[in-house]
């Protein structure tokens, strides 16, 4: 490689990626942080655990401050013995701030992937910019969804390794695969890893087809073996992260329901999420067009129409007579009309890469193109979720791209084929949409996937699948650009440009004129319920059309700029390398400007000093910390009790926030706790309630104090017990009966269990009135890891603790002899105690942590050994180095 190639193919692209990574999130280096509600919630959840670490030296595995107690693996978890790290770990030492790190890792990873696919440096740079500038990715980072972004931005390393392995470049392929799998598994987001595997599967299937066509089975099998080894070792090195997540998932709301009524209502609930919940946050059919027209469905949930449209805003003109209140509404108008409850931005993947995809297909569509196109087409259908097409139409939908491409090739002359393909595809899609215009009533592709596709029912938000389009958009786009630069053709250029412009005009500009789309969303029904006049709703709809049309015009503007660059190349006024760099710059600028509009600095960032941790205690928290040092829990009704972690910072909370809380506790909330039923409040030790007038407080809670901030503290009249001996057992054959009956008993005397749990006990507990000689003394209570009790009973009794049971971790001994803990009162811990005086120890032992640590150590050592051998192989063959080849 000569110096000029080294400069253009490596030095300049890497320098450009460094600059972009630093300046895209430059406020982080100025002392700012994202103003992200999810990040605040995470900090609130983690704070007590970090405080505990300061005292013990390690993060606890249990979080007693959330939902009466839950495992902390998905809050703050320190895996041990992971000696093989993902790329983020190493680059963090350079950039120091996480957003620039993750952005650079994504840029470099996709650059390496396209290089592995045989694309030169300038094109690989353009693909890297197209990849990271997808608006949805920026949305993830700004929302501080670090797990999602780390998986997605390390996945390209694995894809690069995959590509190199199938080219016979074992050494580089193994190293990159190891890095990729470390990031995909260690990124703590199984949903993103699962979606990325769609791409892996599609690529491997393509290579399988290629091996069959060329009869190259031996290289394919060798590459597959290397892939299996590197993927297995990379995943094994992250076992300490993976195993606790997998185990906890079986007990969380992502796992199956044990309730028979749920399984009868929806068989999928035996293993995963409820179908309606799993399909929440689906992309509407119109929303797919935001991939090329960012504001087609209204932009964000609240848009400043005064700023965006000015005097051309119909809603603003209608609201001016209403004075300041009307203007305020226009400045935060609910313009979003897509499929989700709210939106912080679009799925914009770039009009320029889309144009390059069309341009590449005008040249030809090879087998890899078809593999990627069909992967994207299936992803689009699955992302629709609740808005998807009926399953009986799915075969026709899947055939549509193939029919649209091959019918014109068979029956029409060459000049007309691209136009006919575009026309057939758009017309066919439109007709299918008209045939199936009521998706709520049909059995859809997503329903089938939830029932039959392994693990698919563990995840919600089908629109999240569109993250895969970021990979496909950039990959296919750069393949198209390479074809053009290798063989510039004015005729093909004008056809590609014309088809792309026609699609934008038909959808973005004429779609509103001819009412091909409704431009109405779920927010409109809520506004009608609030008696908003129909004339204002009509004006809002008109503004949505205007936003879509202006956004389409902006897409046409960037399309014209990209077309101008390629036209200069056609006329040989611009060299191929400079043209590729210019396209890369335009892709970057387009994405940067769109994302800056969605996430303006003034509303996206806040100074780090303005985020105090811990937050200042509220008056009721200060009062309770100083006035009551015994055991109790609170239920903060002055806020959203089950979606706010702030009250969990200083006190043990029966509520809180977590996107994957324990399944049984969620069912308890839905059935009893949200209704404030007294027996359940008492069994959970909820001594205090806080309220500000929004809830009807149970009469057994007395008003104690009203603080200056308007929060009233209520205290339970009866004493709160932490642990007790059950006088009587109520045994049910079905777990549903146990849950449903909790409100019917005095749970300080009765214990409700299932026949299945009763059979786990070594001794049958007796039902008899307690006498004065029987009782429980708390010797030590450390809810993080150990509880020590002295129990006196004259007969075998069931000891009940007001602690949430998690079977994998919590163990018990009676006088040093291990004894089982069973579910009691649906969620609590129950232990049988024989007659006499005994010492009961309840302790946390994370077997999965220990097992994962051992496996990670083995996997890490194997990874380093593989990497050392692979590095040696690379150096040995350095003199024979050849650039990677594109599979096409």
Language-model region placement:
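Extracytoplasmic
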Residues: 257, 261, 573, 585, ...
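Contiguous transmembrane helix-bundle modules in multi-pass membrane proteins
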Residues: 128, 144-154, 165-182, 190-192, ...
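Transmembrane signal-anchor helices characteristic of membrane glycosylation enzymes that use polyprenol
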Residues: 9-45, 229-244, 378, 426-433, ...
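Transmembrane-helix motifs of polytopic, lipid-linked glycan transferases
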Residues: 100-118, 355-356, 476, 563
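Active-site-proximal, structured, solvent-exposed surfaces of multi-pass membrane proteins
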Residues: 655, 749-888
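Membrane-interface coil-to-helix junctions
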Residues: 19-113, 129-152, 266-351, 385-389, ...
